[in-house]
């Protein structure tokens, strides 16, 4: 039992979630609420990052489960939180704060794929908009020699204001310079490049050919190094494609195995059957249960080498795992004579010798709402006893 579930609720997972479930939840939420896509959801992005930072660390998670958020804040596991952007970059293959200072931002895109795509391999063309250095001004933003140091921030890109918060007490506030928008330099409007309007970069359409190899997994990243947004003075970042697998109507993937449920009739469970299965590469395989091989409800069997191809070893495959569900016939499907004949064919049932101490009871269909209705009626009855209701009386003349 955990002390509180706030972090689990933020990620939308249960307290017993596995690391894979935590990663999947963080990946989807972080991409959805990233400041680049949702500038107004900064606080939500921060909460998601903090929750994942704690729950993805075994020691911090144990501490949180026992003592809640307060235990984390008190520093029992190296308290305090990292930068949400650092967590995002490390998760998606970028790096920490120091790397972002030397390189442009990584651009992360989610690519929806089917289980068939991951089984057979596929190629997708993805059209993206990215920043590239303006070739008209070669990334200067204007004419040669037109760029000058911003006098307001002295080239730092930051302004420092002193704010008095009490007698003898001042607060130093650092903010982005409004004069140069944090660039540390400015260009006279008449000297600005007409192509980029002094921004040094322009938007350009980029077509990426994404190769999805056989056996790739949900959440796997495909990185295009140096294809991210360009910025003067910085090495271009990467474009990172994150595969997001859609649910399949028949199969569920479990590592290298494929799992499915199969309904069979009672006669098939007792007397054998043949069942066709359409595979993800459009083949049809036939599974056989021979007469005399009894299949019980909930039995799990498998077909070797019919699961998912193994990544980078596509000629090897996992297992196709099948769980069987038995469909029993409806009441009265046999006449009394045929039922008696069937009983003679089946293994003998055990008879119970009744004694005087035994009571005969009747089996009825279970109604899950019966207890709820009885509980509700009981409360209403008690309420009437403690608070008799005065009904509106009819007028008499």
UniProtKB/Swiss-Prot annotation:
Residue intervals of every CR-type zinc finger in the record: 121-205
Pfam families, sorted: DnaJ, DnaJ_C, DnaJ_CXXCXGXG
Residues with Phosphoserine modification: 83, 335
Chain positions with N6-acetyllysine modification: 66
Chain positions recorded as Zn(2+) 2 binding sites: 150, 153, 177, 180
Modification Phosphotyrosine, positions: 381
Molecular function terms from GO: ATP binding; ATPase activator activity; Hsp70 protein binding; protein-folding chaperone binding; unfolded protein binding; zinc ion binding
GO cellular component, one term: membrane
Binding site residues for Zn(2+) 1: 134, 137, 193, 196
Cysteine methyl ester modified-residue sites: 394
Membrane topology, from the record: Lipid-anchor
Comp. bias (Acidic residues): 353-365
Compartments reported by the entry: Membrane; Cytoplasm; Microsome; Mitochondrion
Keyword Glycoprotein on entry: no
Residues in CXXCXGXG motif repeats: 134-141, 150-157, 177-184, 193-200
Region spans: Disordered: 352-397
Keywords, comma-separated and alphabetical: Acetylation, Chaperone, Cytoplasm, Endoplasmic reticulum, Lipoprotein, Membrane, Metal-binding, Methylation, Microsome, Mitochondrion, Nucleus, Phosphoprotein, Prenylation, Repeat, Zinc, Zinc-finger
InterPro entries on file: DnaJ, DnaJ_C, DnaJ_domain, DnaJ_domain_CS, DNJA1/2-like, HSP40/DnaJ_pept-bd, HSP_DnaJ_Cys-rich_dom, HSP_DnaJ_Cys-rich_dom_sf
Keyword DNA repair: no
BP term (GO), one: protein localization to mitochondrion
HAMAP family according to UniProt: DnaJ
Function: Co-chaperone for HSPA8/Hsc70. Plays a role in protein transport into mitochondria via its role as co-chaperone. Functions as co-chaperone for HSPA1B and negatively regulates the translocation of BAX from the cytosol to mitochondria in response to cellular stress, thereby protecting cells against apoptosis. Stimulates ATP hydrolysis, but not the folding of unfolded proteins mediated by HSPA1A (in vitro). Promotes apoptosis in response to cellular stress mediated by exposure to anisomycin or UV.
Subunit structure: Identified in a complex with HSPA1B and BAX. Interacts with RNF207.
UniProt name for this protein: DnaJ homolog subfamily A member 1
Higher taxonomy: Eukaryota, Metazoa, Chordata, Craniata, Vertebrata
């Amino acid at each position: 039992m955990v002390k509180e579930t706030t972090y689990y609720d933020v990620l939308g997972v249960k307290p017993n979630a596995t690391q894979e479930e935590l990663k999947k939840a963080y990946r989807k939420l972080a991409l959805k609420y990233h400041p680049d896509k949702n500038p107004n959801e900064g606080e939500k992005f921060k909460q998601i990052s903090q929750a994942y930072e704690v729950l993805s660390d075994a020691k911090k998670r144990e501490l949180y489960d026992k003592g809640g958020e307060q235990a984390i804040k008190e520093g029992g596991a190296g308290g305090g939180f990292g930068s949400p952007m650092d967590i995002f970059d490390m998760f998606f293959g970028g790096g920490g704060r120091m790397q972002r200072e030397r390189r442009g931002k990584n651009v992360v895109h989610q690519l929806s794929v089917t289980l068939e795509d991951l089984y057979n391999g596929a190629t997708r063309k993805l059209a993206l908009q990215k920043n590239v250095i303006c070739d008209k001004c070669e990334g200067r933003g204007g004419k040669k020699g037109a760029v000058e140091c911003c006098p307001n921030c002295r080239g730092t890109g930051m302004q420092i204001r002193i704010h008095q918060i009490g007698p003898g007490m001042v607060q130093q506030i650092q903010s982005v310079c409004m004069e140069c928008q944090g660039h540390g330099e400015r260009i006279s409007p008449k000297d600005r490049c007409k192509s980029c309007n002094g921004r040094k970069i322009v938007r350009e359409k980029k077509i990426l050919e994404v190769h999805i190899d056989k056996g790739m997994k949900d959440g796997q990243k495909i990185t295009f190094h140096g294809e991210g947004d360009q910025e003067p003075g910085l090495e271009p970042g990467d474009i990172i494609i994150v595969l997001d697998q859609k649910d399949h109507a028949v199969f569920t993937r479990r590592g290298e195995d494929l799992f499915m449920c199969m309904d069979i009739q009672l006669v098939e469970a007792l007397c054998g059957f043949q069942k066709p299965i359409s595979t993800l590469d459009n083949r049809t395989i036939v599974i056989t249960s021979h007469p005399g091989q009894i299949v019980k409800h909930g039995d799990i069997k498998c077909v070797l080498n019919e699961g998912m191809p193994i990544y980078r070893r596509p000629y090897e495959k996992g297992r196709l795992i099948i769980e069987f569900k038995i469909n029993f016939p409806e009441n009265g499907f046999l006449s009394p004579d045929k039922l008696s004949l069937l009983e003679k064919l089946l293994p003998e049932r055990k008879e119970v010798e009744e004694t005087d101490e035994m009571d005969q009871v009747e089996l009825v269909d279970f109604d899950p709402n019966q207890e709820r209705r009885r509980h509700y009626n009981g409360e209403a009855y008690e309420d009437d006893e403690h608070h008799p209701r005065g009904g509106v009386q009819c007028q008499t003349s």
